[in-house]
Amino acid sequence: MKIKWFGQSCFMITSRSGIKVLTDPYKKMLGYKLPEEMEANIVSTSHNHSDHNNINVVKSSFVHINELGNFSEHGIEIKGIQTFHDKTSGSKRGKNTIYNFNIDDINICHCGDLGHVLNSDQIEEIGNVDILLLPVGGSATINAFDAVKVMKQLNPTIVIPMHYRTKALGLVGYIFGKVDKFISASGLKVKEYDELELNKANIKDYSGIVVLKYD
């Protein structure tokens, strides 16, 4: 499996058989830039905000996952779990869907724009997590300290932070916190990669926080 980060909450996850899952593609206004001719088999959108729902960037035919429930597409099991974009049950920013993907026997949890610490029902529904894709920048999502709480609630092998300030965001990025604050609060070891490539047999070799670089 390969995992590449395109900035914000957008990842391309490629299975060993070549199936591509794209999460939360954004519009160009962020300062990040997606490839012009993207191809994916599955595209998930956690909520309907423009920095997470630009499915038109994908030029191939694909299955769009944007609902709650259980799905099976291209040999990948997917589960959508109801959460919120804020701490007030969605009254400020609306709903958010966490998506679980089982790819190559590895459970990946993409938290979208999660705005709160999880409750016991949500933790149970999410279940076992091998790789957690977690917002850490605050402002529109959980901040670094609540992100650590969610990390401890789900106890993944690997945490990949997302939705935080980077140089590529320019002035827009100043509304978010830096990833360093989450790293410091977590107390975990950190590795950096341009792209993460792993499998079920060697996943523990990458345990802790993995920071993926934005090209």
Region annotations inferred by a language model:
Residues M1-R16, G69-I81, K200-D215:
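Zn-dependent metallo-beta-lactamase
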Residues K2-W5, K20-D24, E77-F84, I98-N100, ...:
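Active-site-proximal beta-strand elements of phosphoester/diester hydrolases
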Residues N53-T97, F101-D104, G187-K204:
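Metallo-beta-lactamase
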